[in-house]
């Protein structure tokens, strides 16, 4: 690999001619930057002695990439180590299973490219899209008209097409080629990296043309040559944006080539694939791609993946999980944000291409608090959770054969929003989904890169010991639709009953909000013991509600209390409850082994709904044939497994919960009612809110009031 040189940027100049204007197909200028044998380059920078020697980067039994010296001697990417050694006995192998240095260098490249344009979209460790449209326009505006004829293109022009400088699109792309050369030169001078670049009117074409001349070269695609480039593809699966599953469905329809897809009746295609997908892929077949370059931002998830020939025991599985988890915890500590959801993915031995399964669940709040502290105190409870997820997918009493395991942290939140006490279940916001992005998460079989976006159509992927993804999206053509949370922002707040504070109301679960606004189903319920399983808590929420109550009192003296019948009862699977079935009287504590929660949930759900339904309710799962992740909203961190139900189901469950508890807790309710009449309350405390607090918190507050000599007015319901 030769370094870039100033001026020529290590590439040839194309001859420019002036002629009549041609049709403009697009005003955008997009550059796709693809680093040459990225892992090998990082190793050669780390150890310059390897620069002129055949070098391969090994992960497990594969050479995942190699430098061009090795390629000259017959070594290829993804070659078996034994075969590579036979081809090239002098091959130097470096272990590339630790991706830390590759990840660090990858982000340095992205940061450097952002100095040219803020619109930089990561596509794995070694690829980036850059939208240069605005920068190109500024340069053209600053270019004197008399200098336009002397503008030269840097690098190759695809298909040796002549450049017409009277064509504004040609001029834009020529200036884009100059900026692309500057970016490549900066990468070499500042980071020591070389790479290829493709300059085109959209992302699809830039991606395709960047690989025409390699290594360390760049190519410009003019609009008139787009069809030539598209038709040079041997199969539709080579079109970026058409994934494996979509290609298989198209093959069933007899569509194999680009020409087949271009000429296939759109109505038939829409009937088979749906309108959106059909129109999208047919546009791609013509080289049309309107998708924007989306700045990636911080990763939305972290995952570590390990592939192996065979894992057939629970002990082996636990060891793999511990290894993956240890690496993830280090990354969480470095990132500074805290994950609120953990996912386990497995792959069984099979000849199928997509046969992965996954389960995920929220991370308990007391475990979240330990994350990112620099120690591994959170390891034991997380391992317990992951092993429960594992046993939910794999019957360990029967023989099994796994070839892949992955652990993923997602639903990452900034530290400020993560610092919540154990009472945050009362104030859980329903606006934050388990996925912070609409794009789907798909773990690819041959992908070693930590990216804000996974490569959309199996583009130039690498296999690995580990796959580290940052959480977002396969091709939109193959994306799985996920259930969305209810949007509570549209509820008519002006219709709130008197005495209900809007700020407090907004933080209640959606079901309770709707019931307060539209339903009176709880008015006939008696007693305060509506929480089937009270939660251990701090005093934080009491102060919050007390403040809101005093504010409401000042604004409206007649609104002195929030009636308990409106807010006190909650369905078993809403925030503020344990998530156990109505008949359960267990009282788990956050300090206990997390497996207790999962065991209780499994038993209760299996008893009430049967094995099949309970599995769907306990975990966000994937069908092996589809390999998509279905995520339910993370309603609270104390509740590990949320049950996905409709609003009507919530109301029915809440009523059944009260009726089921009434016979078992009659004595307890009578004792509470009797004790309530004697309890002392300071004037700024709402009794109804007080009775919804955990019992030990009630006792602590009562003792404090007695010590402080608080007034003792009789509590009124």
Curated annotation (Swiss-Prot):
**What's the reported outcome of changing residue 524 to Y?**
In strain: BALB/c
Bias (Basic and acidic residues): 665-679
Is DNA repair there in the keyword field? yes
Where is the motif (Ubiquitin-binding 2 (UBM2))? 685-702
Q: What is the effect of changing residue 334 to K?
A: In strain: BALB/c
Consequence of changing residue 4 to S: In strain: BALB/c
Q: Region entry Disordered: which residue ranges?
A: 1-22, 549-589, 603-622, 644-687
Q: Where is the composition biased (Polar residues)?
A: 607-622, 652-662
Cofactor(s) named in the record: Mg(2+); Mn(2+)
Q: How is the cofactor bound?
A: Binds nucleotide much more tightly and catalyzes nucleotide insertion much more efficiently in the presence of Mg(2+) than in the presence of Mn(2+).
Q: Which GO terms describe its biological process?
A: cellular response to UV-C; DNA replication; translesion synthesis
Q: Which InterPro entries match?
A: DNA/RNA_pol_sf (IPR043502), DNA_pol_Y-fam_lit_finger_sf (IPR036775), DNA_pol_Y-fam_little_finger (IPR017961), HUWE1/Rev1_UBM (IPR025527), IMS_HHH_1 (IPR053848), Rev_trsase/Diguanyl_cyclase (IPR043128), UmuC (IPR001126)
**Pfam families on file:** IMS, IMS_C, IMS_HHH_1, UBM
Q: Which GO terms describe its cellular component?
A: nucleus
What does the UniProt PTM comment say about this protein?
Monoubiquitinated. Protein monoubiquitination prevents POLI binding to ubiquitin via the ubiquitin-binding motif 1 and ubiquitin-binding motif 2.
Q: Which GO terms describe its molecular function?
A: damaged DNA binding; DNA-directed DNA polymerase activity; metal ion binding
Which domain of life does the UniProt lineage start with? Eukaryota
Q: What does this protein do?
A: Error-prone DNA polymerase specifically involved in DNA repair. Plays an important role in translesion synthesis, where the normal high-fidelity DNA polymerases cannot proceed and DNA synthesis stalls. Favors Hoogsteen base-pairing in the active site. Inserts the correct base with high-fidelity opposite an adenosine template. Exhibits low fidelity and efficiency opposite a thymidine template, where it will preferentially insert guanosine. May play a role in hypermutation of immunoglobulin genes. Forms a Schiff base with 5'-deoxyribose phosphate at abasic sites, but may not have lyase activity.
Tell me which family the UniProt entry assigns to this protein: Belongs to the DNA polymerase type-Y family.
Domain notes from UniProt: The catalytic core consists of fingers, palm and thumb subdomains, but the fingers and thumb subdomains are much smaller than in high-fidelity polymerases; residues from five sequence motifs of the Y-family cluster around an active site cleft that can accommodate DNA and nucleotide substrates with relaxed geometric constraints, with consequently higher rates of misincorporation and low processivity.
Q: What is this protein called?
A: DNA polymerase iota
